[in-house]
């Protein structure tokens, strides 16, 4: 059972951007 790379990647990129935006 592999998680959706697209969904995980998108969420990861958004979270990463938000983290570095603070």
Curated annotation (Swiss-Prot):
Entry superkingdom: Bacteria
Catalytic activity: (S)-malate + NAD(+) = oxaloacetate + NADH + H(+)
Keywords: NAD, Oxidoreductase, Tricarboxylic acid cycle
Gene Ontology MF annotations: L-malate dehydrogenase (NAD+) activity
Residue sites binding NAD(+) per the record: 9-15
Role description: Catalyzes the reversible oxidation of malate to oxaloacetate.
Recorded family membership: Belongs to the LDH/MDH superfamily. MDH type 2 family.
Protein name from the UniProt record: Malate dehydrogenase
């Amino acid at each position: 059972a592999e998680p959706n790379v697209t969904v995980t990647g998108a969420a990861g990129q958004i979270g990463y951007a938000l983290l570095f935006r603070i």
